[in-house]
Amino acid sequence: SLFFSIGLLAHAQSCTGLWITIDDATGYKKSIVELYKKEGVLYGKVVYIYKRGKDGPNSKCTECSGKLYNQPILGMLIAKQLKWNGSEWEGGTILDPDNGKTYTCSMWLNENNHDKLNVRGYIGPFYRTQEWIRTDKIPTD
């Protein structure tokens, strides 16, 4: 039905925007990633780094290889090529700037709270899922 497909479309678009990432080890806010769509494909770039991080806003990707080695993490495109499958964004990749590794990635909104996004990175059969928190602004410190 038309109503159903409009609902799916709204659902597919609703993970665009600003998301706070949380450090798994400390539980502290780490960065803000902006998720945006380009030609129906989802991408994410780092738009803010909290001061508590390694080198704060000046952090470089010292563990990255190739062109990304030692590049600033602020502004870095870390999520790429995710496509909507009807229930989640999948088939893309996500880079963890802390270890320089790129993982296969999927993302989906928490069905009980659309201000929480599940972000799962896979290497082979192993995976880790993080929860990102929606925000509507970038701090101005």
Regions found by a protein language model. Give the residues of each.
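Edge beta-strand at a domain terminus
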Residues: 114, 122-141
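Short aromatic-glycine motifs in intrinsically disordered, low-complexity regions
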Residues: 64-69, 116-124
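C-terminal terminal-subdomain/extension
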Residues: 104-109, 114-118
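General beta-strand recognition
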Residues: 20, 43, 90-91, 116-118, ...
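Bacterial N-terminal signal peptides
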Residues: 1-7
